[in-house]
């Protein structure tokens, strides 16, 4: 397994009415080791939908802000509730990549893994492949896109680029 390509693939703005599950299932059917990280706004999903998604073992739900506002400041209590009550993983990506220093420190204190834009100078996880482009030749990729097409990197629009990965690619959770 050491020579196989490893990919951390994530999509922003996953929710109950904007989920592209049919396309995600197509990827799962093509790639035996497929896993995906989906960043969602908690208020955009019903409890029954979250319960359904949690049963799909190759999907990891991550926090994409609390209400998708620019530079929002989510309280520590709200961040704890997301993990304890709704089962979100301690992985956070700020909406619009805008993360205040206060929020950054709060997330670190709560032991969240913080996703940052590649241009951000702070410590965090940064993607190295925008899926609107063909995958680079690197053996380890952190691919990023959106569930819907917002910047040319929507799942449907970039599907062919993902399909260019070797079928034995090992997908990982963040």
Segments predicted by a language model, with ranges:
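His/Asp/Glu-enriched short active-site or ligand-binding loop at hydrolase and phosphoryl-transfer sites
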Residues: 103-136, 169-174
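Boundary/entry segment of secreted carbohydrate-active catalytic domains
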Residues: 1-26, 34-35, 170-174
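Metal-dependent polysaccharide deacetylase catalytic core of the NodB/CE4 family, i.e.
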Residues: 33-104, 139, 143-147
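C-terminal domain-boundary segment and adjacent tail
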Residues: 2, 31-32, 148-174
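Well-ordered, non-membrane alpha-helical segments in soluble/globular domains
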Residues: 18-27, 75-82, 152-165
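A conserved mid-domain beta-alpha-beta active-site/ligand-binding segment of alpha/beta enzyme cores
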Residues: 127-153
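Short acidic, S/G/P-rich loop/turn micro-motifs used as interaction or catalytic elements
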Residues: 14-17, 69, 147-152
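Alpha-helical scaffolding within the catalytic cores
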Residues: 19-24, 44-54, 118-136
């Amino acid at each position: 397994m050491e020579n196989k390509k490893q990919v951390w693939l994530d999509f922003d703005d996953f929710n109950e009415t904007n989920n592209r599950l049919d396309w995600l299932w197509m990827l799962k059917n093509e790639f035996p080791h497929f896993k995906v990280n989906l960043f969602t706004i908690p208020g955009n999903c019903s409890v029954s939908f979250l319960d359904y998604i949690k049963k799909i073992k190759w999907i990891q739900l991550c926090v994409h802000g609390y209400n998708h506002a620019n530079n929002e400041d989510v309280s520590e209590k709200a961040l704890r509730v997301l993990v304890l009550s709704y089962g979100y993983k301690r992985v956070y990506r700020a909406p619009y990549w805008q993360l205040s220093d206060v929020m950054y420190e709060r997330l670190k204190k709560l032991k969240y893994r913080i996703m940052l834009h590649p241009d951000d100078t702070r410590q965090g996880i940064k993607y190295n492949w925008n899926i609107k482009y063909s995958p680079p030749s690197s053996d380890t990729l952190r691919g990023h896109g959106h569930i819907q097409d917002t910047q040319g990197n929507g799942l449907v629009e970039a599907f062919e680029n993902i399909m260019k990965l070797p079928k034995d690619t090992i997908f990982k959770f963040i």
